[in-house]
Amino acid sequence: MDKETIKAHKISDEEYAQILEILGREPNLLELGVISAMWSEHCSYKSSKKYLNGFPTKAPWVIQGPGENAGVIDIGQGMAAVFKVESHNHPSFIEPFAGAATGVGGILRDVFTMGARVVAGLNSLKFGDIHDEKCGKHQKYLVKGVVNGISHYGNCMGVPTIGGECAFDECFNGNILVNAFALGVCKSEDIFYAKAEGVGNPVIYVGSKTGRDGLGGAVMASDSFNEESKSLRPTVQIGDPFSEKLLMEACLELFKTDYIVGIQDMGAAGLTSSSFEMAGRSGSGMKLYLDKTPMRESGMTPYELMLSESQERMLICAKKGYEDKVIEIFKKWDLDAVVMGEVTNTGKMELFWHDELVGLIPIEPLSEKAPILSRPTSEPKYLSEIKNYKFELKSSVQELFIQMLQNENINNKAFIYDQFDSSVQTNTIKADGRLGASVIRIKENGASVAMAIECNSRLNYVNSKIGAALAVASAGRKVACTGAKPLAISDCLNYGNPQNPEVMWQFAQGCEGIKEACKELNTPVVSGNVSLYNETEGVSIYPSPTIVSVGVLEDANKTLKASFEKENLSVYLLGESLGEFSGSMVMKIQDKKVSGSLKELDYKAELALWDLLYKANQNSLLECANSVGIGGIAMTLAKMFAISSVGANLTSDFDDEKMIFDESASRAIIGLSKENEEAFLNLAKEFGVKAYKLGVSTSQKHFKLDSIELSKAELDKLYFESFKEQIQ
C-alpha cells in the first residue's frame, strides 16, 4: 500500500502498523477504507473515550444509557422517553441546507430505530459574527440555509420542532455548530436494540438506494477546515424526508411484530459502521454480499458501497425464516428491502462481491476494542491573561439594557422558529418563543415531558470545567421552571482540534464538569455525541458542550408558563446574586471582551431551587417561572414581560446598579398571586432558598426596573423586531 493512499485515509504510521498486526498482512483498498472510517474520531471516539467513561449513567429511572442509538428513561405508567442530541457541524458549514437537513434526519433515525415514535425536536445553533464586514454576509447565508434545512426536514417528517437556542460569536466565523436533538415515546417493554446475533440469521438492508453521496463523510468530520475544504461538497449527504417518513412508518409497523433480533440505522460511515457496530455489540461475525446492495448509480464499487453515507437506510438482523415477512412490510411502504448477508460466529466481517471474498476484517478491533488515544493536555495560556479582568459600568444601565435586549444573542428569534411546525401531532404545550424549556403532553399517561437545550460557549472559554457544569445546571433549571423534575441529560461535546494540547485540556475539563454536575444534581448522562476538529486555519471554536436536560411532570395540566398573564401578581427573585460578570453578556457588549474567572457552582443551592419549584407547583402556588440566565435578571424580566400582556413595576434593591446584569447561577424569577405569598415564603424558607420581592405586574403598558423605564411598545419593539432587521 503506497504512503499517499494511507495518508489520504488519515491513517497514521502507528495506526498502519496496528492494521498490519491485526490483519497479519497488507490491507487492500476496501479494507483500508473501512478501517479508516471505523477508526476515525467520528466513529471511534478515540481521543474522547477515556474522559467519557467516568460519566454517571445509572439511576432507577434509566432504562438504557450510552452505547445504544439513543438513551431511554422511564416516564411513568409503562411509558419511556427515548432521546439523543448530536452534531452535524462540518456538513452544515460546507452545505448549510443539506447538512442541517440530514443532521435532523440522522437524529430522528437514531430515536425511531429504538422503537419510539418521534414526538419532539430541539436544536442548538451557533453562528459567527453577522455584523462582520468580511464574513457577516456569509454568516447570514448560513443562518438562512441551516434554518431552512432543519424546517424542511422536520416539517416534512411531521415532527414538531418545539425549541432551541441560537448564539452568535466571532469564534464561530470559521466553524458553525448545528446540534440537533430528538425525543420519542414508546412503551418501556417495546424498545429495540442494535444487535446482530444468532448464527445464520439474515441481515437485511432496508430503505433508500445507495449512491455516492456522503462518501468519506465520517473521515471529513474528523478533520479541521482549511482553504481546500470548499471542495468537500460531495461529502455532504442529500436527505429526502419523504423517504424517511416512509422508513419510520415501516419500522414502527415492523416493531409490532416479533420478526427481528436487532436494527441499526446507517449513519456516519454508512454500511460499515452499522454492520460493525451490530456485530461488535453482540460478539458475532457477519457476511455481507455487497453486490446485492440496492444501488442508485451504476458502476459502484465495494469501497463506495461500504462507505457511502446515503440517507434513509437501515440494517436489520431478522430471525431466520421471517425474511419474506420483513421484506413485505418495507415493499408495502415502497422501500427497498433485500437480504444481503447473514450472522456468523467467526468474529470477522467477510465482504463478498459476486461471490468473491474481497475483504476480511476482525470486528472487535474496529468496534468494541478500537484504539483509544491518550493525547497530551496543557492549560491554555490565555487563561492567565483573562482571569483578573473585572467588569465595571462605563455607560448608563438604560443604555446597556437597550443594547442588550436588541442584541442577536438575546432578542426574539421568531425569524427562525416561525419556520418550524411546532404544533403538528397536537401534543405541544410550550414551544419556542415562550422562554425556557419546551414541553409536550404524553397522552398515554397524562404526564408532560419538559426539555431544554443549553450551552453558553463564553463561560466555557473562561473556565471549561465550571462552564460545562453550568450548562448542566442551567438546562436542568429551565426544566424545573416548568414544574417538571429533571431526570437525565444528553450531551453534544463540540470542541476544537484534539491534536492541540490546550483544546484537549479544555475537553478533559469540560467532561470533568459534566461528570461532577450530573452526579451532584442526579441527572445521569444517557446518550451523547462528540464533535472535535471544529477548527479553521488553526483557530478553534470556544469549548461548547451542548446539554439537553429532560424531565417529567406527572400531571401535564400543571405545566408552568414563563409569562405574566395577570396584573397584581407578585414578582420574586429566587436565589442569591453573587456578582458573576465573568464571561457575561454585559461584558461582551460593553467591553467587547470574554474574560474573568468563574465562581464554583453551589450544587446544594441549585438542587434546593429545583425542589422548591417542584413542590410549590405541586401545591399550586405559582403562576409562572423562568430561569435567570444570559443578561441577568434585567434580560430575564424584560423577556418575560415582552411575551406577557401586562406591565411591570419592579425594584431590585441592589446596592450596585450593575447587579441587574449579574449572571449568577441557581436563580429564577417567579410570579404568584398575593394570597399564595405567605405559603410560598414559608416553603422557600423550608428549602433554604432566599426569596426577594421585586414588585408587581401592572395593568399599565409600562416596564420599570430600577432606573430603567420603557413603554411596553418600546420593550416589545426592541425584543421582537431587532433580529428580523439584523438578519436581512
Swiss-Prot record:
Main location, first listed in the record: cytoplasm
Gene Ontology terms: biological process: 'de novo' IMP biosynthetic process
Keyword ATP-binding: yes
Active site: H42, H88 (proton acceptor)
Binding positions (Mg(2+) 1): E86, N529
EC assignment: 6.3.5.3
Keyword flag DNA damage: no
Keywords (A to Z) from UniProt: ATP-binding, Cytoplasm, Ligase, Magnesium, Metal-binding, Nucleotide-binding, Purine biosynthesis
Family: Belongs to the FGAMS family.
The protein, known as: Phosphoribosylformylglycinamidine synthase subunit PurL
Lineage: Bacteria, Pseudomonadati, Campylobacterota, Epsilonproteobacteria, Campylobacterales
